[in-house]
A protein has these predicted regions:
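Active-site acidic/histidine proton-transfer and metal-coordination neighborhood
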Residues: 78-135
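N-terminal pre-domain/capping segments
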Residues: 1-72, 76, 80-95
Length: 135
């Protein structure tokens, strides 16, 4: 990517598959796009279809797309006071980062969460620990 290059895109649905996202982006003249790695309200991610991912990678390369932005679910809270919520967040983060290895060189956007009364120091430590464990 050259510093003067500008990539324009939007958030697209992954519901019809990864190659379909690329085709949707092309149909609107986008040169990048963002997508949720799973349902934005949480839950399990769909099984990854490696052939579908390969087709997307070919499309991205052929049309000189810029970096993509994978977006974590909004329910991911790495600093929740509830252990089960933190466990889901760590699992989702780990799974998403593993999935993004199929699209190297792209971005991963997540909201680290809310400390829900535990205080910023506790939250920062929980987020830091989770990132260190997952990376």
């Amino acid at each position: 990517m050259q510093p003067e290059e500008l990539f324009i895109g939007c958030h697209l649905s992954a519901g019809k598959g990864w190659e379909a996202m690329g085709k949707d982006a092309l149909s609107i003249g986008a040169t990048t796009f963002a997508f949720f790695t799973r349902n934005p309200r949480g839950g399990n991610a769909k099984a990854l279809d490696e052939a579908d991912v390969a087709k997307l990678r070919e499309l991205l390369e052929a049309h000189h797309f810029g970096p993509l932005v994978a977006h974590a679910p909004y329910t991911m809270n790495l600093c929740s006071a509830k252990e089960e919520t933190r466990d889901f967040a760590r699992r989702a983060l780990t799974e998403d980062l593993e999935r993004m290895e199929h699209l190297p060189g792209n971005y991963y956007n997540f909201h680290p969460g809310s400390h829900v009364g535990q205080g910023s120091d506790v939250a920062i430590e929980q987020i830091s620990d989770a990132l260190n464990d997952c990376l």
